[in-house]
């Protein structure tokens, strides 16, 4: 059976208005508004002096979610998911719920770095951890013995990586992969996908900021590149035809070894 694997990153949701992290040019630090990510996205800081500040940060991010909406790219992926049952697989490094709101059930998406609407709760030291869906509500950490946003922090193990690698290891010539809006900074999907290309997997990259080195590597491997945002690519008739021809068993594109 032909499969489509969609790997999405921050650029997939950016056009919906979901803010992304930026790098401060003067300090080189990664920031989200006034927050230093080393303080609010680091497991060691969370366990130290930044427990409450981290929850304030994620409360703001959670409150932002209902103010943004799925864009055309989310809706297109959801349309394919519904039109081609069992053929479309979603892997995302995003923690928002826009794919779910577009029509892809949460359980049918692998959230590689967690899910913003959930918290992990421990009622007392050593007790089993529970995952609670808090929706868009503000969390008061003092209401729990211990709690943490169900989001993977720097310095923390990511349980979903194992399942992600299992999926990528199964790629064959029957598969097509779209990598959309991924910076390849935390996870370099190029190194995971180039071996699959040699096995015949077709790969499309959607990224307006492909650098020269990446372009050389993509060209050498026969990776088709769309140098634009997610919305533009997923509304491009040629792009849509390539994907749908693949899913329907027609000739799509050839990969080089």
Q: Across the structure, where does each feature detected by a protein language model lie?
A:
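Conserved catalytic core of sirtuin-type NAD+-dependent deacylases
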Residues: 1-257
């Amino acid at each position: 059976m032909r499969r489509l694997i969609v790997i999405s990153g921050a650029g997939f949701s950016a056009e919906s208005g979901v803010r992304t992290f930026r790098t401060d040019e003067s300090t080189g630090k990664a920031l989200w508004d006034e927050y230093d990510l080393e303080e609010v996205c680091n497991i060691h800081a969370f366990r130290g002096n930044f427990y409450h500040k981290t929850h304030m940060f994620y409360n703001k991010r959670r409150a932002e979610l209902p103010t943004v909406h799925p864009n055309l790219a989310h809706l297109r992926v959801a349309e394919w998911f519904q039109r081609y049952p069992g053929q479309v697989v979603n892997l995302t490094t995003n923690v928002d719920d826009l794919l779910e709101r577009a029509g892809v059930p949460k359980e049918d998406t692998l959230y590689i770095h967690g899910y913003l609407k959930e918290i992990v709760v421990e009622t007392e030291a050593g007790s089993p951890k529970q995952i609670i869906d808090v929706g868009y509500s503000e969390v008061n950490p003092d209401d729990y013995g211990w709690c943490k946003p169900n989001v993977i922090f720097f310095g923390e193990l990511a349980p979903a990586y194992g399942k992600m690698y299992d999926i990528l290891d199964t790629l064959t010539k029957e598969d097509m992969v779209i990598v959309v809006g991924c910076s390849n900074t935390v996870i370099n999907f190029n190194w995971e996908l180039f071996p699959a290309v040699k096995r015949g997997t077709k790969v499309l990259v959607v990224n307006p900021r492909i650098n020269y080195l990446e372009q050389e590597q993509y060209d050498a491997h026969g990776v088709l590149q769309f140098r634009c945002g997610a919305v533009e690519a997923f509304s491009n008739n040629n792009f849509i035809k390539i994907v749908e021809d693949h899913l329907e068993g027609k000739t799509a594109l050839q990969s080089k070894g």
